[in-house]
A protein has these predicted regions:
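Binuclear metal-dependent hydrolase catalytic cores
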Residues: 1-137
C-alpha cells in the first residue's frame, strides 16, 4: 500500500492570498501546500480521500490516472469543491462511487445539483454513485 499526501494545507491553502505571515512569504517549497487530500494505492486499486478545489492540480501533479472511489470526510468546500473535476475519470471508468455520511451527500446534492439530476442531465456532467457511510460500526 502507498499513501500520498496530495495536500496538507489549511482550508485556504498555503500561502494564503494577501497574507503577510512569514510562512506565507516563505520561499521554502515546504511552505507551498495545497488543500487537504490523500491518494491511496493498494494493489490495483486507487482511492482518494477528499477532493477540494485543488483536486485537478493534485491529480495532474501526482500522475494519478485512475480513481476507484472517493471518500468525503465532511462537507466543507475545501474537501468537496473538486467534485466537477472527476469527469476525466468518468470518461475512462464510468460512474464514480463516493462514500460519505448522509449529511455530506445531501450537501453535495444541494451544491452540485446538476451532478445528481436524473432527468435532462447535462451531457458531460460528473457521474457519481453516492454510498452512505453509517455510524453503526
Amino acid at each position: 500500500m502507498k499513501v500520498y499526501f496530495l495536500g496538507t494545507g489549511t482550508s485556504q491553502g498555503i500561502p494564503v492570498i494577501g497574507s503577510d505571515h512569514p510562512v506565507c512569504k516563505s520561499t521554502d517549497a515546504k511552505d507551498k501546500r495545497l488543500r487537504v487530500s490523500i491518494w491511496i494505492r493498494w494493489d490495483n486499486y486507487s482511492y482518494v480521500i477528499d477532493c477540494g478545489p485543488d483536486f485537478r492540480q493534485q491529480m495532474l501533479t501526482s500522475g494519478c490516472k485512475k480513481v476507484d472511489a472517493i471518500l468525503y470526510t465532511h462537507e466543507h468546500a475545501d474537501h468537496t469543491a473538486g467534485l466537477d473535476d472527476i469527469r476525466p475519470f468518468n470518461f475512462r471508468q464510468g460512474e464514480m462511487p463516493i462514500y460519505a455520511h448522509q449529511r455530506v451527500i445531501e450537501n453535495l446534492k444541494e451544491r452540485f445539483g446538476y451532478v445528481f439530476e436524473t432527468v435532462n442531465k447535462y451531457p458531460g456532467a460528473p457521474s457519481v454513485l453516492p454510498i452512505e457511510i453509517k455510524n453503526d460500526v
